[in-house]
């Protein structure tokens, strides 16, 4: 057998040359105590605030309390498999989630892991969940409408792209239904509209029943709206840290569209439950409680989240992220801690009332208490032309209706005002899952403010509206097209619309 020393030595030298000299260094700590989703860890001296750490078995956690002798870690998952003395590793990464168009049509948890059984998500980009909101210079004032398809909102409390509009009300008043209709209303733009106007939707479910989230996803899927939506779900059975993180994760996914010159709409449903889970974490981390036992920084929790919704200027791509946070009140009490906080952070609120809901006024929007601080700059000119008068008339109607309860002998002008107000209130009702295009809303409200409903019985208003819309879609499509393209009611269009209304009103019985 021929042994070649030179060859063997060459192989050995090659092996030695490639031998790794660096030992793998990872900073580790030990679990001192664990319980209620919180672990106290000794060691990890150089850990960053908000850094992801790893427990045995691949369970992740986030370092929130950095104290002199230990680190308070919240656990993203079950703490049953973690025990005292376990080794905890630093990952060196701040909590981040996958972002990008690959997530559209998917249901994910607060860490961006798919939970819909449709296989892995092949997203190439990741983004930190908690980033700084854009400053003042990169922003632009809100000036484009974000149409929800609901007459009561688009006419009276308009929402613009880049705005934060709070949806607030007691349980079972239709808060989620408003978000759902706003999502469904984007379908027409996605199917035929220009690329620059498409609005991608993100729905964050915090602390909801799984059946409720499944129902929401089912409706989106059945109506063809899931393909441009992302669902982030941290349900009631998920640990508090996941419920706390979900809105930030959803926001990071929405920011991808905002920062790439596209438009996104995000609904947080709801931030009351996020505040409750944050309170739970803070108390277990032994942070001092404040009002209603919430920690002192619960205002900052919501403000840093909602400030990330913005309209960017043209240099930054002119994208936008619109936020519709939801807050659940107890017994219509908007003066509680969390409702007042979020009202002061947002650019207006849509106030829903149980009484209106049970009277059959749905969406149950209290027009008197609801405001949009962006106002008519988020409306097209055509909507401003018809909505200006409806606001005034409804305000007068509410005032008069209060007095009319006491006196029976009313003069003709007051009676006329009450009649008109009752019909306009009826006109603003809208069944669920039937959002209207802006030009259709304009035509319907035009009929209302120009007296076409005054002679009808209140019960026939809905029937009149349905008939009018069918008539305009078939006979008067040119009028609707003109309103859509001109974005205003010109004198010519006004004449045609009046003629169409006259001919329809004659035939309507």
Swiss-Prot record:
Coiled-coil intervals, chain numbering: none
GO molecular function, one term: proton-transporting ATP synthase activity, rotational mechanism
Keyword tags: ATP synthesis, ATP-binding, Cell inner membrane, Cell membrane, CF(1), Hydrogen ion transport, Ion transport, Membrane, Nucleotide-binding, Translocase, Transport
Amino-acid positions noted as binding ATP in the UniProt annotation, renumbered to this chain: 169-176
InterPro entries reported for this sequence: ATP_synth_asu-like_sf (IPR023366), ATP_synth_asu_C (IPR000793), ATP_synth_asu_C_sf (IPR038376), ATP_synth_F1_a_nt-bd_dom (IPR033732), ATP_synth_F1_asu (IPR005294), ATPase_a/bsu_AS (IPR020003), ATPase_F1/V1/A1_a/bsu_N (IPR004100), ATPase_F1/V1/A1_a/bsu_N_sf (IPR036121)
Catalytic activity: ATP + H2O + 4 H(+)(in) = ADP + phosphate + 5 H(+)(out)
Membrane topology listed for this record: Peripheral membrane protein
Top EC group: translocase
Pfam families: ATP-synt_ab, ATP-synt_ab_C, ATP-synt_ab_N
Function text: Produces ATP from ADP in the presence of a proton gradient across the membrane. The alpha chain is a regulatory subunit.
Subunit organization: F-type ATPases have 2 components, CF(1) - the catalytic core - and CF(0) - the membrane proton channel. CF(1) has five subunits: alpha(3), beta(3), gamma(1), delta(1), epsilon(1). CF(0) has three main subunits: a(1), b(2) and c(9-12). The alpha and beta chains form an alternating ring which encloses part of the gamma chain. CF(1) is attached to CF(0) by a central stalk formed by the gamma and epsilon chains, while a peripheral stalk is formed by the delta and b chains.
Gene coding for it: atpA
PANTHER family: ATP SYNTHASE SUBUNIT ALPHA, MITOCHONDRIAL
Protein name: ATP synthase subunit alpha
């Amino acid at each position: 057998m021929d042994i070649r020393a030179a060859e063997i030595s060459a192989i050995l030298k090659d092996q030695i040359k490639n031998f790794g000299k660096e030992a793998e260094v990872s900073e580790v700590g030990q679990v001192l105590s664990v319980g209620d989703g919180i672990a106290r860890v000794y060691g990890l001296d150089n850990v960053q605030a908000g850094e992801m750490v790893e427990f045995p078995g691949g369970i992740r956690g986030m370092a929130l309390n950095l104290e002199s002798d230990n680190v308070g870690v919240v656990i993203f998952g079950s703490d049953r498999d973690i025990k005292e003395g376990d080794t905890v590793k630093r990952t060196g990464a701040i909590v981040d989630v996958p972002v990008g168009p690959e997530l559209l049509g998917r249901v994910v948890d607060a860490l961006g892991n798919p939970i819909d059984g449709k296989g892995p998500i092949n997203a190439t980009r990741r983004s930190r969940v908690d980033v700084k909101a854009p400053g003042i210079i990169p922003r632009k004032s809100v000036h484009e409408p974000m149409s929800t398809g609901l007459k009561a909102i688009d006419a009276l409390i308009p929402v613009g792209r880049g705005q934060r509009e709070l949806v607030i009300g007691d349980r079972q008043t239709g808060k989620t239904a408003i978000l759902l209709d706003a999502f469904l209303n984007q379908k027409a733009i996605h199917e035929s509209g220009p690329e620059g106007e498409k609005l991608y939707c993100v729905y964050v479910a915090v602390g909801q029943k799984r059946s409720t989230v499944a129902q929401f996803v089912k409706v989106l899927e059945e109506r063809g709206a899931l393909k441009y939506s992302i669902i982030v779900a941290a349900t009631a059975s998920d640990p508090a840290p996941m419920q706390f993180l979900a809105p930030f994760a959803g926001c990071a996914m929405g920011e991808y569209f905002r920062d790439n010159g596209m438009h996104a709409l995000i609904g947080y449903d709801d931030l009351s439950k996020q505040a409750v889970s944050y309170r739970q974490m803070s108390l277990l981390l032994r942070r001092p409680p404040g009002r209603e036992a919430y920690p002192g920084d619960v205002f900052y929790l919501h403000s840093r989240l909602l400030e990330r919704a913005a309209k960017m200027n043209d240099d930054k791509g002119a994208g936008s992220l619109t936020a519709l946070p939801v807050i659940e009140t107890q017994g219509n009490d908007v003066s509680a801690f969390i409702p007042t906080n979020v009202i002061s952070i947002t650019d207006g609120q849509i106030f829903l009332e149980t009484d209106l809901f049970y009277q059959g006024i749905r969406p149950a929007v209290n027009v008197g208490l609801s405001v949009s601080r962006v106002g008519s700059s988020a409306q097209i000119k055509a909507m401003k032309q018809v909505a200006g008068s409806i606001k005034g008339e409804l305000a007068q109607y509410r005032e008069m209706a209060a007095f009319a309860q006491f006196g029976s002998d009313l003069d003709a002008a007051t009676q006329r005002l009450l009649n008109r107000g009752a019909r306009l209130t009826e006109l603003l009702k809208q069944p669920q899952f039937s959002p209207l295009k802006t030009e259709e809303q304009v035509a319907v409200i035009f009929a209302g403010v120009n007296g076409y409903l005054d002679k009808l019985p209140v019960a026939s208003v809905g029937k009149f509206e349905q008939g009018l819309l069918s008539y305009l879609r078939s006979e008067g499509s040119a009028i609707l097209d003109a309103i859509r393209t001109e974005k205003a009611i010109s004198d010519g269009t006004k004449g045609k619309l009046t003629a169409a209304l006259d001919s329809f009103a004659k035939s309507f019985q």
